[in-house]
Structure formats: C-alpha cells, structure tokens
From Swiss-Prot:
The lineage of its organism: Eukaryota, Viridiplantae, Streptophyta, Embryophyta, Tracheophyta. This is Protein UNUSUAL FLORAL ORGANS. One of its GO terms (molecular function) is ubiquitin-protein transferase activity. It comes from Arabidopsis thaliana. Component of SCF(ASK-cullin-F-box) E3 ubiquitin ligase complexes, which may mediate the ubiquitination and subsequent proteasomal degradation of target proteins. Considered as a meristem identity factor required for normal growth of the young floral meristem. Acts together with LEAFY to positively regulate the B class floral homeotic genes APETALA3 and PISTILLATA. In this way, operates as a region-specific regulator for petal and stamen development. Alternatively, may play a role as a negative regulator of the C class floral homeotic genes. Keywords: Activator, Developmental protein, Differentiation, Flowering, Nucleus, Transcription, Transcription regulation, Ubl conjugation pathway.
Amino acid sequence: MDSTVFINNPSLTLPFSYTFTSSSNSSTTTSTTTDSSSGQWMDGRIWSKLPPPLLDRVIAFLPPPAFFRTRCVCKRFYSLLFSNTFLETYLQLLPLRHNCFLFFKHKTLKSYIYKRGGTNDDDSNKAEGFLFDPNEIRWYRLSFAYIPSGFYPSGSSGGLVSWVSEEAGLKTILLCNPLVGSVSQLPPISRPRLFPSIGLSVTPTSIDVTVAGDDLISPYAVKNLSSESFHVDAGGFFSLWAMTSSLPRLCSLESGKMVYVQGKFYCMNYSPFSVLSYEVTGNRWIKIQAPMRRFLRSPSLLESKGRLILVAAVEKSKLNVPKSLRLWSLQQDNATWVEIERMPQPLYTQFAAEEGGKGFECVGNQEFVMIVLRGTSLQLLFDIVRKSWLWVPPCPYSGSGGGSSGGGSDGEVLQGFAYDPVLTTPVVSLLDQLTLPFPGVC
C-alpha cells in the first residue's frame, strides 16, 4: 500500500513507539521511548523478551496502513503477511473493521463502444484504485496491475473486489484481494449479457453473487429479463449460476450497482424511480416504491449498519418546498421509508452551486456516506452518527483538475465502493475446486 497521504503527511514512525508523562520537581516533562545513550527507539531489555506470539497479537490489531508500515521494521515483520500462523491468529481475533472507500476512474456505460472480438483500448485508468480512509481523512493509492486488461470493477465485499469482463457475452468475474494481490476466478455466467447489475456478498465462510438484467436477446438488442445467482460456502454447498426468478416487468436497472443488506440485494429501478429487491433464500424479486419518487434526482442506494439507505436530491419545482438532499431508511417491513437526515440548507446551497445539475454518486460504509460530485474533484463526507458534514480534500492521485477526477472528461466518473481491507480471505480457496486459473493471472 502506498503510504503517501494528501494531508498531514507525517514522517514514518515505528508502530510501537510511544510517549509517557512523568513529574519531577513539580514540572512535567514528556519523554519518548528513544534511549539517548544508545539511540534506539525502544528498550531492548524489555521488547526483546516479549514473546513473539504476544507481539503478533498486538500487530494483528493494527489498522491496515499501520500494519504495512510495520512491515518496514524488520524481516520477521515483513514476512507476517505470508505466515500461516500469524494469519490464523488474525482471523481468530477478528480485529475491528477498518471502514474505507475504494474509488476507480471508470468510463460511463454510454462511452463504451462494443466491438465484436475487442474491448475498450484505454486501460490506463483501471490499473490503480484510490483508497480513502474516512477516519483519518487520508488518501492512498492501490495498484491493480495484476488485473488483466478488458475488466472493470463492479463491487466489493469482505475485503474482496470484483472485476467483470467488458466484452458482451458470457461474463467472467474475478475476485481479488488488493492488499496481497491475489486473484480468483468464478465460472462464467450461464447467459450472455451486456452490462448487467452485479451484487456481491462475501463472508468468512461463503460467497454469493447475483447478476441481473441486460440479457442479450440478439447481437444488437438487450432486455432486462432474468437474473442468475452463484453460491459457495464452507459447508460444501455450492450452486453454479442457477437461474433465479424473472425480473419484474418493465424494469429499468442502473447497470452495475447492487447493495447487499441482511440477506437481500437491492438496486435502483428507473422510469419511474423505485427499488428492486432480490431475496436470496426466497429466490424472489419484489418492487418497492421509492419515497417522493416523482421529485428525486440522482438517487443512490447504500448500506449503513445493517440498514438500506436511499440518498437523493429532492426538487419540487411547482411546490413551495425548498430543494434539498435527503436520506431515507427502509424499515423492516420492506415497504416503508423514514427520513433520517436532511442536508442543512446553507450547505445544500453551496453543494448545488458546485454540483451544477451534473448529478452526483453516493456510497456508504457503516456510519459514513461519501458523496462524489460528477465533473468535479469534490467529495462530501457525512457522518451519520455525529451528524457532521465535511468537504474532503481532493484525491491527489486521480489526475489534475476537476474534470478527470470527478468525471466529465472522456465520459469518466469516479466510481466508489464500500471497502473493508483485510489481510487474508481464505474463503476464496473454495473457488479453487470449481475453476481453472484465469489466463494471465498469477
């Protein structure tokens, strides 16, 4: 992981350095662990006798950025990422989730020109992702050079990022762990599609994928007719792209976006706005009416602490209601929406001026909601728990100027996913017995 940050770029420090305060002659002084006589960071008489298993348990609780800085300390720390003993300890401890967002510069679907036997020629933007840590307000850069050309990112879950083949037909899906550079392939889907909506749910013991819509009924026509699902778990049960129930009539999906919440996949439906829900265990699709559906603009679905959240701008031109950006939560009856937050009006006035009617994208992870303004380099971070709004410093790695970072030039957008970095994802080993290695993937 690139440890360069956009703001408050600190010098690299050892992860176990610390300070303490002591009193002497009624004056308070602060001392560090540095030994002035030996020049060492820590007292070797203490730390050299600390049992390695105990030290490994401490390291296992470090946030991913701190863990990768720790690997620079010595050869043993560097090798922890490849140590089965350490990784088993890491999985047993289940450290607290480090909620992040992962962004990619990605072309909009309208900018793709499909050619039989070929794919999009511009793959430069797909070689890297931009990791944003909302806890520290820092940007990092991740390399995805090991992903073959002709694939685009489609989702993230359980520390894995999914990539889907661009070429129309029987789609191939790859799952990768960006922290270790591992790649696993799912079997090809069973029905030819163009740009379907794809949902991903990964737990420590199972993988679920749902692919819906954009059925190729001819080389030149698509319809939203069907969906198919993939499941594999540690209990030995697997289902390879079983055709599920048909999609609701006259649905218009937003290709590529699905959200998983408590056993269901959700995606936006257009013209008019509504929400489609697929219950995995019940194998059925239902349509949920969206709140204020005739007055919504740029609606997005996201997951927050086990709840489905709808974020959208509300514009009622013929009514005496101020324009605003609102958040609704879907209740347990799977039909009722409750407004949980509204952007303060002074902030919305500034937001609307910067957004300029070009639209925006939203992605959520636990208590954080990230709003990306199209055609600009601006992002707005909302903390649901603290009820705080913050303009985020632009990503320093995504190109100069506002157009390329937020979208607008050459049909590019900054596409984001909720991402929880983890050091190991042993569940992908379940795929080894199902597929052969993908050509060109190590």
